[in-house]
Design a protein with these regions (language model features):
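C-terminal extensions of enzymes
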Residues: 1-7, 159-229
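Active-site beta->alpha loop and helix N-cap motifs at the rims of alpha/beta catalytic domains
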Residues: 1-23, 28-32, 39-42, 46-53
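Conserved active-site and cofactor/substrate-binding residues in soluble primary-metabolism enzymes
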Residues: 13, 20, 82, 86, ...
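Alpha-helical packing segments of well-folded alpha/beta enzyme cores
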Residues: 14, 18-21, 25, 58, ...
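Surface-exposed helix-capping loop/turn segments at secondary-structure junctions
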Residues: 28-38, 99, 205-217
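Glycine-rich phosphate/ribose-binding loops and adjacent secondary-structure elements
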Residues: 32, 37-158
Length: 229
C-alpha cells in the first residue's frame, strides 16, 4: 500500500511487488487445508496509487487469478475524494461484476454511498469507532462534533431518525457532558451510535438498490450527510 503522494516509479515498483507476492500467496493458500471445518476466501488486492494506467494493469492482473473476490487497496490514504472515486471507477470497469468488490479502509458515509454507485460491494474502516471516541457522530442529518459548545443545552436525541437504543435514550447535551468530563461512557455511547448508523446506512442502500431507487436516494442522502451541524 503506497502513501499519498508518491511518484509514479515508486507506485509501479510497489504494484509489481504486490503481484509477485500474490502468486506466492495463492500457492500457499491453495495448498493449506482449512481448520475446524471452515474454509477461507482469498481476495487479491489491486494497487497502483492514483495512476490510471497502473490501476488498469493491476486490476487486469488481479482479475486473471479468478479468486473468490477482489479487493482495492491504496486508497483513502490522503488523496482527494475525486481521485478516490476516479480510481474506483477505473478498477471496477475491469474487475468481474459477479464477484465481490471490496474497497479497503473506506470511509465516510458519503464515501460509502458514492463508491457503491461505482460498483463496490464491501468496505471496512475504523472511522465510525475512531471518530466516535473523539466525540464525532454521524447522523441522518449530518455530522456532529459533540464536544462543541453549541450542544451544551441541546436536550434533543442524538439522532431523531436513529435506529440504535442510544439515539432515543441519551441527549446531545448529556453525551457532551460525558465527553467534557472524560467519562468513558460518552465514548461508548458515541461508538454504539456510529456503528448502528453505518449498519443502517448499508441496509438502506441495499434496500434502495433492490427497489431500483438507489441513485435518487443516494443523491438526496449525500447532500445531508455532507453537512457539518
Amino acid at each position: 500500500c503506497t502513501p499519498y503522494p508518491c511518484d509514479y516509479d515508486y507506485a509501479k515498483r510497489s504494484m509489481h511487488m504486490t503481484h509477485r507476492w500474490l502468486k506466492r500467496c495463492c500457492d500457499r493458500f491453495d495448498s493449506t487445508e482449512g481448520k475446524y471445518g471452515f474454509e477461507q476466501t482469498f481476495f487479491p488486492i489491486v494497487q497502483g496509487s492514483v495512476y490510471k494506467d497502473l490501476r488498469l494493469q493491476s486490476a487486469e492482473k488481479i482479475a486473471s487469478f479468478e479468486r473468490e473476490g477482489n479487493a482495492i487497496g491504496g486508497l483513502s490514504v490522503g488523496e482527494p475524494h475525486h481521485m478516490m472515486y476516479e480510481m474506483t471507477e477505473t478498477v471496477c470497469s475491469v474487475l468481474p461484476w459477479d464477484k465481490p468488490r471490496y474497497l479497503m479502509g473506506v470511509g465516510t458515509p458519503v464515501n460509502l454511498l458514492e463508491n457503491i454507485a461505482l460498483g463496490i460491494d464491501m468496505f471496512d474502516c475504523v472511522m465510525p469507532t475512531r471518530n466516535a471516541r473523539n466525540g464525532m457522530i454521524f447522523t441522518s442529518e449530518g455530522t456532529i462534533n459533540l464536544k462543541n459548545k453549541k450542544w451544551e443545552n441541546d436536550y434533543s436525541p442524538l439522532d431523531p431518525n436513529g435506529t440504535s437504543f442510544v439515539d432515543s435514550t441519551y441527549t446531545k447535551a448529556y453525551v457532551r457532558h460525558l465527553f467534557r468530563s472524560n467519562e468513558l461512557l460518552g465514548k461508548q455511547i458515541a461508538t454504539l451510535h456510529n456503528i448502528r448508523f453505518y449498519l443502517w446506512l448499508m441496509e438502506e442502500a441495499q434496500k434502495q438498490l433492490e427497489e431500483g431507487t438507489f441513485t435518487k436516494w443516494k443523491n438526496m442522502m449525500v447532500k445531508k450527510l455532507d453537512l457539518r451541524l
